[in-house]
Amino acid sequence: MDNGARPLRDAKFFLVVRFWIAPGGEPQVFRWLEGGHIAEVLRQPGFLWVRRLKGTEPDATGWSAHAMIYGIESRESYDRYMANSALHARFKKERQPLEAKMRIERFAGEVDYAL
């Protein structure tokens, strides 16, 4: 996994995975993420780095807020990743035991370095 040595500016595209974890669910969710899921995503062509964030406040239901930000070489690399139906089917199956403990939403786009 990237240890932060790659410059953030290498990324021209990004994927943000926002997720909320039920109280008591963090150990199981983090075991899944750190046990291979993050590394598998970073092995995809064009994926450069990842950063994990933890929100300071839980949501209204008490679930903790988190996000993963993936830096990606290009829109084409992102599109290839999203088109990999076998990979996403496997990820979905791996997440099934976590469904009651985790809510996920995603968004992606171009990095604006003009700001």
Predicted regions and their residues:
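Short beta-strand/turn micro-motifs at beta-sheet edges
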Residues: 2-7, 54-58
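Short, flexible turn/loop "capping" segments at secondary-structure junctions
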Residues: 7-13, 60-62
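Active-site-flanking beta-strand signature of metal-NTP-handling nucleotidyl enzymes
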Residues: 12-20
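Extracellular/lumen-exposed scaffold segments
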Residues: 18, 112-114
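Short amphipathic alpha-helical segments
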Residues: 25-52, 90-91
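An amphipathic, aromatic/His-enriched active-site/gating alpha helix that lines ligand/cofactor pockets
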Residues: 44-48, 61-63, 71-108
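Flexible, low-complexity linkers/stalks enriched in Thr/Pro that connect modular domains
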Residues: 53, 105-112
